[in-house]
Amino acid sequence: KIRSSNWSDFNSFYFDRNHKMNMQSPFCSSIGADLQFMAVALGYDVNISRLTGGKDRSKSEFNVEFWSGLISGRLYSINNTDGMTITSFGGMKDLDMPYNGISSTIWGIEVTCFINPRRYSNAAAFSFGKLQLRSQGSWMVGLAFQSQKIDFDFSSLPEEIQQWLPEKWQGMRFATDGINIGVSGGYGYNWVPRRGWTVGVQALIIPSLNYGYVNTDQKKYSFRMNHRLNIGAAWNHDRWFAGVTAKMDASLIYYHSTLVNGLINIEAKAGWRFNLF
């Protein structure tokens, strides 16, 4: 199958009721191809944004997924040392203010088990490796491990934003470096409006225990909460298939404020199924 992918990471700070700031990196675009046999897929991507000299040359995303009827697995990493664009702060919106004082490195491993594997197929709506003949849903549970390192240098913010920040945050450095171990739980549903069509929705929460540094010199335990929403649509005709998926991950970090750190990924795929034997 061939694939086109667009992704972006974002951060939202909620300092208090009157001080909120949002930032997002430019979307990174790539095209690639996969060869999939049963639950294993091998592929290669070409970064279009890098070839065309886009702003996001220092961004990278790596993602490997495994699917079967009963379980799915995922290994991923996200790196951004290229900065972001501040899109809003206070009552000002639709901004385009460069901010280079950020560095983030995140990687993780996840395994998810589907409670109703005989009637519900995760692959039908998200990897297009199987067919869903009737509408059906399933609860899901899993385990998640994540290494998260994020650094914000607020002294690099534009002067007008530094003056707007609460006094204790002006010129501050916000840094977190640790690991998260969590248990995931959620529900997925595939709707089959007519033969050959599948629309899938998944929602999960991942409460996690974090051990690491958060603006201190000593490691501490803290609580983290991750949220995930996946939406997919697939069309199948004989051995041909095409579809689109949209996935969003958001992690909530609490430290005298709330930081929402997340990723948006949109993919379009098309391909042909064949039998080796």
What positions do the PLM features span?
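Surface-exposed strand-loop-strand hairpins of Gram-negative outer-membrane beta-barrel proteins
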Residues: 7-30, 41-55
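Predominantly the C-terminal beta-signal and adjacent terminal strand-loop region
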Residues: 228-277
